[in-house]
Design a protein with these regions (language model features):
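Binuclear metal-dependent phosphoesterase catalytic core
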Residues: 68-74, 155-196
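His/Asp/Glu-rich metal-coordinating catalytic cores
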Residues: 3, 12-162, 168
Length: 196
């Protein structure tokens, strides 16, 4: 695995203690070869009190600055375009960013938002995302795994967070070889909620 994308709410709280953050950072350090690229979402916006500001993070963890931007992972021939939050709600749709003009690069878009018609959490148009020119669109905010449009994926949360989150939880593994890519869901959760 070369890199891991986290589309918001990596910390899911501003209330974490420094000791908890150091434990998370130590786990990240144990990733021998992978880098984590994260954007902030509605539960972990980059504000003055952000938990992200409490410690110095591992070099393996890249938190995209608030706003819209790009990060190039040249060793992987990949450019990631993102929007990272600095507030708890975003009711206005975002002007959809365009892929990088760099030729021969795999183009990824990372957003934290909601494909529901009306939302206080960055309303997104799944079809517009699918037709945006990105090779892969990684979304966060919805905790259930789903693919709302071609090349547009919510992996959901790795673990169910409450009784309303039944079903499989895990992540998407995306393998890229030249022009071909294969996207498969990998179940990961250690616990499961079921309706009886």
């Amino acid at each position: 695995m070369d890199f891991i994308l986290c589309c918001g709410d990596f910390l899911n709280s501003e209330e974490l203690r420094v000791e908890e953050l150091r434990n998370i950072n130590a786990m990240i350090e144990r990733l021998k070869h992978a880098v984590i690229v994260a954007i902030s979402g509605n539960h972990d916006p980059q504000t003055e009190n952000s938990a992200y500001r409490k410690i110095d993070w591992s070099k393996r963890f890249y938190l995209a600055p608030a706003g819209t931007g790009r990060v190039a992972l040249s060793s992987y021939r990949t450019v990631i375009t993102y929007h990272s939050w600095n507030q708890k709600e975003m009711e206005q749709p975002l002007e959809l960013p365009k892929p990088s003009a760099q030729q021969g690069q795999y183009q990824i878009l990372m957003l934290h938002g909601d494909t529901a018609a009306e939302s206080r959490y960055l309303p997104l148009d799944a079809q517009a995302l699918s037709q945006s020119g990105f090779d892969y669109v990684a979304l966060g905010h919805i905790h259930k795994m789903q693919q709302p449009a071609p090349d547009v994926y919510y992996c959901g949360s790795l673990e169910p967070l409450d009784f309303g989150e039944s079903g499989e939880h895990g992540f998407f593994m995306v393998d890229v070889e030249g022009e071909r890519r294969r996207c498969r869901f990998i179940p990961f959760a250690q616990r499961e909620y079921r309706t009886i």
